[in-house]
């Protein structure tokens, strides 16, 4: 925006950089943010599914997501993991192996008996840092809608909600369509 012979950037700026290209030389300079650290995707392996449940009764969306994870994992030859957190749930964990999960990671502690965003987010973070799955699927349940954005923000990664189509690229990028 030009005001009193001076250029200024306001809230309407769309970052098109036309002012840099077309404006007077040196009047506006575009400074890029620091380059983000590149991630070695070969270190990230597996597709994880968050097991949503109430008192050990697994929500049906979990089984749907396991099926989709299995389909996606087969395209890139990766394992399917299930992340199961709660209290007195170990006996239910084995059941998930019959639905195509290669490995179930169980966090069974009294503190996890009821959903608390802080503790569940911390457990999720611990799981991700230790096991480095290349993608995580979480159901659009009451808990999932609270937990997924918090975990994505904590891990500084993306999140797509309410996807209708999921596809896995050969380079392990997850393509989502809403």
Question: Across the structure, where does each feature detected by a protein language model lie?
Answer:
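N-terminal glycine-rich FAD/FM-binding segment characteristic of electron-transfer flavoproteins
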Residues: 1-178
């Amino acid at each position: 925006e030009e005001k009193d012979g001076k250029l200024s950037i306001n809230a309407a700026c769309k970052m098109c950089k036309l002012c840099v290209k077309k404006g007077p030389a040196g009047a506006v300079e575009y400074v890029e943010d620091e380059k983000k650290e590149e991630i070695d995707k070969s270190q990230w392996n597996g597709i994880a599914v968050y097991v949503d449940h109430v008192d050990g009764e697994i929500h049906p969306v979990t089984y749907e997501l396991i099926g989709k994870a299995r389909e996606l994992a087969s395209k890139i030859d990766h394992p399917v993991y299930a992340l199961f957190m709660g209290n007195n749930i170990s006996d239910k964990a084995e059941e998930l192996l019959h639905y195509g999960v290669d490995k179930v990671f169980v966090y069974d502690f009294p503190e996890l008996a009821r959903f608390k965003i802080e503790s569940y987010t911390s457990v999720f973070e611990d799981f991700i840092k230790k096991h480095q799955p290349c993608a995580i699927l979480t159901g659009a349940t009451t808990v999932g809608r609270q937990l997924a954005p918090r975990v994505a923000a904590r891990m500084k990664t993306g999140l797509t909600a309410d996807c209708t189509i999921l596809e896995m690229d050969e380079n392990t990028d997850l393509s989502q369509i809403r």
